[in-house]
Amino acid sequence: MNRRFPLLFFLALLLSGSSFPQIQDKEDFKSFLGDALIAPAHFDSKDFIPLGVSLAAISGSYFLDHQIKTLSQNNRTPTADKIFAADKYFVEIAASLSALTYFYGLAAENYKTRRLGLKLAEAFLLQATAMVSLKFLVGRERPASGTSNDSFNPFNTSWAFTSFPSGHTSTAFALASVIANDTDQIGWKITAWSLASAIGFSRIYNNEHWLSDVVAGALIGYFAGEFVSAHKSNTQSPPVQITPIPLSVSIPLN
């Protein structure tokens, strides 16, 4: 089964929904998609600083790839193996979380929860688009398949050449960014970022990715979540629904 089936199922239901909240969410989702597609065309001078910092972070981590791989593989333990094996199911859990959050909010008529689910799905979709495109374009060999961090085979769909960037990490940081922006409670913020960081570390520990893959994935996810959270459709106030009051008219009979 497709690992992202829960999210695809959710999007299908959202786009076919006919209730008032779903119609509103459908229009907001279309607005988000349109703006996300044209966002690269609006790149301007203020974007150069975060871009430069991101490229510097990825480049710097590249020179630490082998050291971090050696350190992580030389310090494996049976207990840590069991703990970090959980990342195997993370993508399915993340996709299901987005869908379940949305439909719970819809069923409970909870606007904030419903919109959180929609934002999680939008962030998931945005980072996945960037992540899958880069994997195909870069074609970097995974550490488990080769011995060098500079082995590239662009436009290769083989799993062994889909190392850059880390998809698990980009997913984790996209969801963490949305959750952190959605809550004022410091405990939830710390939990979200801590779990995202643990997912990133697990990919290195399990020898699935180089450090620079994880750094790139974290940055992609973070900026995807920030874009979603700042989008105009996600910063507006809840709509006001007017419920008609039933009137009773009595006519006295003489």
Report the location of each language-model feature:
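Alpha-helical transmembrane segments
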Residues: 50-57
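Well-ordered alpha-helical segments within folded domains of soluble proteins
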Residues: 98-102
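Membrane-interface helix-loop junction between the first two transmembrane segments
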Residues: 65-75
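A generic structural signal for nonpolar/aromatic side chains embedded in well-ordered alpha-helices
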Residues: 68, 86-87
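Active-site-surrounding "flap" and adjacent substrate/cofactor-binding loops of secreted or lumenal enzymes
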Residues: 77-84
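Residues that form generic nucleotide/phosphate-binding pockets
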Residues: 36-39, 71, 82
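Alpha-helical transmembrane segments of multi-pass membrane proteins
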Residues: 57-67
